[in-house]
Amino acid sequence: MEPVKNLARLSRTLGYEFTNQELLVQALTHRSAANKHNERLEFLGDSILSIVISDALYHQFPKATEGDLSRMRATLVKGETLTLIAKEFKLGDYLFLGPGELKSGGFRRESILADAVEAIIGAVYLDANMQACETLLLSWYKVRLDEIKPGINQKDPKTILQEYLQGYKKPLPDYQVVQVDGEAHDQTFTVECRIQDLDEVVTGVGSSRRKAEQLAAAQILELINK
């Protein structure tokens, strides 16, 4: 797939039209593909995401403690959440990667996907302003902000899914590693997850088996909650 031809489609999916398309291209460019890559934009986007989510939680939960606010923010801005957002946007289809990353499945690697989301946030800030970033991020996070609650230990997706199934006296999820790519120090795991009463088989891809299972479980939870 040639990413450049699909930038208009991606902009519609993101909900933002760039004035300077080069910023979007840079946000999608991994360091393996070009000298003008997305790492500086990622640095900027990481800070913007943190302050927007912090502000949203502060006003949404006026009685929450600092500890609760910190835990909720950590849940919303962590790499696994950003990877899920990237998958919702099918961001892997638009990334510019070097030959080595392409061969090793970099378009599915959670760290690359999460970094690209943050880079896009940074690109929107430079293309427009902070208000545009806030409006866009609140639209991306609407469902997650509606669902999150203070005073609750922010459990990981595997634990939530397991407890959900146990509550209905159903069998536990079946996780199977179906593929391992890359060298020992930089591997990518592909895990399939199946549960009873759900025909769809969900796939998670991560830098460890555990991370891949967590991503698969999170996608199952999203299907259940639809």
From Swiss-Prot:
Its main location: cytoplasm. Its cofactor is Mg(2+). The keyword Metal-binding applies. Residues 156-226 form the DRBM domain. GO terms for biological process: mRNA processing; regulation of gene expression; rRNA processing; tRNA processing. Mg(2+) binds at residues 42, 115, 118. It comes from the Bacteria. Digests double-stranded RNA. Involved in the processing of primary rRNA transcript to yield the immediate precursors to the large and small rRNAs (23S and 16S). Processes some mRNAs, and tRNAs when they are encoded in the rRNA operon. Processes pre-crRNA and tracrRNA of type II CRISPR loci if present in the organism. Homodimer. This is Ribonuclease 3.
